[in-house]
């Protein structure tokens, strides 16, 4: 059966519209979890103020030189802030991916599903999802740091990995290997969606300053919720493509 991107876009839009309230609640809950965890594990404002102290950072040409010029205390604060941001983001993303994929599964099986039920149903796969997202995020970001194209390519070929892990109960490495083969064979369907998702995420970061009127925590929840909705839309599209390929 020939699969057209247009028909998949239409199916994705219909599902997203019909389940919008549930998806919005999942996105909002995951955003709240991300912000709360980030706030709980981040250094205090007093500790963060250390990063702006002293003249040792002036004239640093790049990130690596900036870190090298920091005092050990400043490096420790920066490391803790980065670790808190990374950990909270990974947990939020894992819950989002698990919740959305289980929502799709349950709705497709004819069940009425709430946001909490979808997230609760995803609990058994969350540890594996967390590790999978950690590995894939690391690979994609390393590719982005070296040269942009390898990072984008890795994001494309690993796109089906979370779906295979949840839908087919695969292991982490098995899902990554299978995703690479399947996504590469269906590049015309996967690549535009992933590139569109990356562009949308980038634009959201560029317009993040528009939320400056809100308090920092509220602004962070709003931005994360919008980002989660974009990711949920991509997951629905990829799940639909995957099921059509399998059939």
Swiss-Prot record:
Gene Ontology cellular component list: plasma membrane
Keywords of this entry: Cell inner membrane, Cell membrane, Membrane, Transmembrane, Transmembrane helix
Disulfide bond sites: none
Localization annotation: Cell inner membrane
Cited InterPro entries: UPF0259
Listed transmembrane segments: 20-40, 87-107, 119-139, 146-166, 189-209, 219-239
Pfam family, one: UPF0259
Record membrane topology: Multi-pass membrane protein
Family: Belongs to the UPF0259 family.
Protein name stated in the entry: UPF0259 membrane protein KPN78578_12180
Organism: Klebsiella pneumoniae subsp. pneumoniae (strain ATCC 700721 / MGH 78578)
Lineage: Bacteria, Pseudomonadati, Pseudomonadota, Gammaproteobacteria, Enterobacterales
